[in-house]
Amino acid sequence: MGERGVEDKSAVQESATELEAGIGYRFVNRQFLAEALTHRSWVNERRGEEGIRDNERLEFLGDAVLGLLVGKMLFARFPQSREGVLARMKASLVGEETLAALASARGLGRHLLLGRGEERSGGRERRSLLANTYEALLAAVYLDGGLGPVERIVEQDFSPLLAGIASGATGRDFKTEFQEMVQTRFGTAPTYELIATDGPPHDRRFTVIAMVAGKRMGEGAGRSKKEAEQAAARQVLARFAAEGEG
């Protein structure tokens, strides 16, 4: 490998530790990570060199792994939703725009190996390229460590998004509905208090209680505070409905 290749390989190794810390997973075989970050434009500039592969095969596998895990999350969190609704939610969650945003949030663009032309044309910020790299990274983690580590990453990234689409999935925004009910009945607004934060930094789980005039009304948990608040509001509404007070 030429001098530029050695420098590029070294750069990948140096950035690997930073990237691993960000996703909460340390690779046993960093070759999987290096391949996930290698765009075909970089490979095309080094035709004839041995052992260089782009990330397109990993992208293919990552798409399947991501689809499985997001489907599993939707199936568990929206037990009353029918297949068509779940399919639409899944399509919106794993679309290019969402994946590119997640890749940008994790800073994947700056870790990429790109050819000169791709670099000059702004490839590090190109949405399609970032989305593909996100899928390739998930596949790399899967091949290196199995489904468990990938599921933790996907839960971390997608749980806040699931909370955001909860109203679209059910036709209800539980926090807003709860607030309107409380204002009508009690002339005040509910409040939420965070009572527990569990798990490592890359896999937090929040527990909150919903209160009205200082009285505890319900409790909910989620991967984000917003999701936990929605869960708490939903619990209160469900209880009121069961008691015939909805």
Swiss-Prot record:
Mg(2+) binds at residues 59, 132, 135. It is found in: Cytoplasm. Coiled coil: none annotated. Keywords: Cytoplasm, Endonuclease, Hydrolase, Magnesium, Metal-binding, mRNA processing, Nuclease, RNA-binding, rRNA processing, rRNA-binding, tRNA processing. InterPro entries: dsRBD_dom, RNase_III, RNase_III_dom, RNase_III_sf. GO terms for cellular component: cytoplasm. The active site is at residues 63, 135. Its cofactor is Mg(2+). It catalyses: Endonucleolytic cleavage to 5'-phosphomonoester. Residues 16-146 form the RNase III domain. Residues 173-242 form the DRBM domain. GO terms for molecular function: double-stranded RNA binding; metal ion binding; ribonuclease III activity; rRNA binding. Its EC number is 3.1.26.3. Its main location: cytoplasm. GO terms for biological process: mRNA processing; regulation of gene expression; rRNA processing; tRNA processing. NCBIfam families: RNaseIII. Belongs to the ribonuclease III family. Digests double-stranded RNA. Involved in the processing of primary rRNA transcript to yield the immediate precursors to the large and small rRNAs (23S and 16S). Processes some mRNAs, and tRNAs when they are encoded in the rRNA operon. Processes pre-crRNA and tracrRNA of type II CRISPR loci if present in the organism. Homodimer. This is Ribonuclease 3. The gene is rnc.
